[in-house]
Amino acid sequence: MGTIYLFRKTQRSLLGKLTQEFRLVTADRRSWKILLFGAINVVCTGFLLTWCSSTNSMALTAYTYLTIFDLFSLITCLISYWVMMKKPSPTYSFGFERFEVLSVFASTVLAQLGALFILKESAERFVEQPEIHTGRLLVGTFVALCFNLFSMLSIRNKPFAYVSEAASTSWLQEHVADLSRSLCGIIPGLSSIFLPRMNPFVLIDIAGALALCITYMLIEINNYFAVDTASAIAIAVMTFGTMYPMSVYSGKVLLQTTPPHVIGQLDKLLREVSTLDGVLEVRNEHFWTLGFGTMAGSVHVRIRRDANEQMVLAHVTNRLNTLVSSLTVQIFKDEWARPVLASGAMPPNMLNIPDHHVIQMPSLKSTMDELNPMTSTPSKPSSPPPEFAFNTPGKNMNPVILSNNQTRPSGVGFNYGTTPYTTTFNHGLGVPGIGNTQGLRTGLTNVANRYGTYTPGQFTQFKQ
């Protein structure tokens, strides 16, 4: 018999979670309008795809893909309402704003993939151009144009509105802007409509409808069926050129990059923060775009020991909150200090060297693993080198090698005994089979010379 859990938490399926979130969105009356336009879009797309099949027009198919993109934009707008209703959770501490960024990126990338598919199909049609039926070509064009413009202008799509303004201009917008300047020079009243730049979605809808109208006229007059393929290529190229800057911008937001137009302002604010009273250093600063129009960041601030943490935190937050809405500031007090230098009298057993000493050398493998041959200091592979201090053994000291069969020199007042510094001898020099001498690395290289007892035959040196 299995274990019975009285208060076990039920796990909801993915479909159940989606249904719960959909009910949360539909609770807001503003989403009803989006759902209505979405239903109409599905019906219009179904009719347009049927007419594309009956007319055998590739240009109308490319224009229908713009209607499908409008459906994606409505879904993005619905996600934007859902993001405003949701509160941050432990898993998503910064909120759910990146979901609408991901939705914009996915919509623009799918539109570009559809444009590439149209280009591939159009290239195949150049080899053998089929006959185009113009019975419902013009009807489908006006139905798609009216619905696209009506949905774009009736619903305020916040994510796409922000991206279309923040992203770089497409080549279609630049060419239309040049023509608009020339036209506004003749008719100044049109400057409010065409300048500074038109909405890219409205522009591509109008340009695609004009291409289809030209296609209809040429096929009706001259039976020139190749113009349908040319119009399909033109609509696909315009679609790709319009969506590419938006996908690049939303992709940079997903990669947590800092917007280029904000870098100068952030540098100025960080310089101001570094000059605040009590602030010693500003480091590990990282700022990125969390969502459309929302920035997040984190910074580490090192302050003096006597500085007021709350006061510094308030000033830093006040300076950076003008640009960064979600800010994390970590305050560190200056607790760094140099290691205490050894000072005082020399221990008396420092110079105790036995007459006939036998020093038990440590294992060669363990010693070489534990000691660094350059500093004689225990080191770890991942740890930084030890801090330099005076009167300590180091690589700048000249080592001393003591002979094993040395004689007592006259005039030296050494007390012979066992030396306690068994771990400071050079490893490998006293091991049988390697050599018969043992090296003592010490910071007292010049001690013997200091007491006037150094003789060239007594000590020898080796180079590192």
Swiss-Prot record:
GO terms assigned for molecular function: monoatomic cation transmembrane transporter activity
Pfam families per the UniProt record, alphabetical: Cation_efflux
Methyltransferase keyword on record: no
Extracellular side: 55-64, 120-134, 222-228
Recorded topology in the membrane: Multi-pass membrane protein
Keywords attached to this entry: Golgi apparatus, Ion transport, Membrane, Transmembrane, Transmembrane helix, Transport, Zinc, Zinc transport
Main localization (coarse): Golgi
Cytoplasmic side: 1-33, 86-98, 156-200, 250-464
Transmembrane stretches, start-end: 34-54, 65-85, 99-119, 135-155, 201-221, 229-249
Cellular location(s): Golgi apparatus, trans-Golgi network membrane
GO cellular component: trans-Golgi network membrane
Keyword Acyltransferase found: no
Single GO biological process annotation from the record: zinc ion import into Golgi lumen
Subunit structure: Heterodimer with SLC30A5; form a functional zinc ion transmembrane transporter.
Function (record text): Has probably no intrinsic transporter activity but together with SLC30A5 forms a functional zinc ion:proton antiporter heterodimer, mediating zinc entry into the lumen of organelles along the secretory pathway. As part of that zinc ion:proton antiporter, contributes to zinc ion homeostasis within the early secretory pathway and regulates the activation and folding of enzymes like alkaline phosphatases and enzymes involved in phosphatidylinositol glycan anchor biosynthesis.
Family according to the record: Belongs to the cation diffusion facilitator (CDF) transporter (TC 2.A.4) family. SLC30A subfamily.
Name used for this protein in its record: Zinc transporter 6
Species annotation: Xenopus tropicalis
Lineage: Eukaryota, Metazoa, Chordata, Craniata, Vertebrata
